[in-house]
Amino acid sequence: MTQDEMKKAAGWAALKYVEVDSIVGVGTGSTVNHFIDALATMKHNIKGAVSSSVASTEKMKALGIDVFDLNEVSELSIYVDGADEINAHMDMIKGGGAALTREKIVAAVADKFICIVDNTKQVDVLGQFPLPVEVIPMARSYVARELVKLGGDPVYRQGVITDNGNVILDVYNLKILNPKALETQINAIVGVVTNGLFANRGADILLMGTPDGVKTSTN
């Protein structure tokens, strides 16, 4: 099984958690694109979706899935999204695609967070993948200095503007032993919109594509 085939298996496995007549929270990324393809097969049985990015919105609309603004929706039963890293406690690093803030907002609304990944994303300790931090542009240098104080090496992601008009700092060389505490600490830096640690709101269900099929874990 190739990596993409494992992603596809995980994406399609999430379809069984979609309820008839519901609005589905949909994330962003290569694994989520497989879920969107799967979701399109039952588009007539759901009300539609809420999207975490312009890219996912465009893909769903092209496939005929109705997309709602989150402000129109008071509840979501599930949010389906991928991760750049996930540990045994279902804490995650997300934001490689720069959609972390909207992803975190939609995840906060949903009753259940279903994380879909291939087995290369599972780690013992978070931090090998650089931690994305979304920053108000004028605060970039200040936030970078504060992140250095935390032991990280922040790098400005050149040429990337988020859907919210902000910039991304990717923080390297963090060994994240307490994800919840670090998520809170970084978010308290003035000028930070949010960071890519999803620990205070981690995943509830993990669907991991492996060479032996999709493995399911619950939190």
From Swiss-Prot:
Q: Which GO terms describe its biological process?
A: D-ribose metabolic process; pentose-phosphate shunt, non-oxidative branch
Q: Catalytic positions?
A: E103
Pfam families noted in UniProt: Rib_5-P_isom_A (PF06026)
Keyword annotations of the record: Isomerase
Give the SUPFAM superfamilies listed for this entry.
D-ribose-5-phosphate isomerase (RpiA), lid domain (SSF75445), NagB/RpiA/CoA transferase-like (SSF100950)
- Tagged with keyword Isomerase: yes
Q: Among the entry's GO cellular component annotations, what is one?
A: cytosol
Pathway info: Carbohydrate degradation; pentose phosphate pathway; D-ribose 5-phosphate from D-ribulose 5-phosphate (non-oxidative stage): step 1/1
What CDD domains does the entry give? RPI_A
Keyword Lipid biosynthesis in record? no
| One Gene Ontology term of the molecular function aspect | ribose-5-phosphate isomerase activity
Give the residues the record marks as binding substrate: T28, G29, S30, T31, D81, G82, A83, D84, K94, G95, G96, G97, K121
- The record's EC number reads 5.3.1.6
Q: Which domain of life is it from?
A: Bacteria
InterPro entries noted in UniProt: NagB/RpiA_transferase-like, Ribose5P_isomerase_typA_subgr, Ribose5P_isomerase_type_A
> What reaction does this catalyse?
aldehydo-D-ribose 5-phosphate = D-ribulose 5-phosphate
UniProt subunit comment: Homodimer.
Instruction: Say what the protein does.
Output: Catalyzes the reversible conversion of ribose-5-phosphate to ribulose 5-phosphate.
Give the family from UniProt: Belongs to the ribose 5-phosphate isomerase family.
What's the protein name?
Ribose-5-phosphate isomerase A
Q: Give the organism the record lists.
A: Shewanella denitrificans (strain OS217 / ATCC BAA-1090 / DSM 15013)
- Read off the lineage from the record: Bacteria, Pseudomonadati, Pseudomonadota, Gammaproteobacteria, Alteromonadales
* Gene name of the encoded protein: rpiA
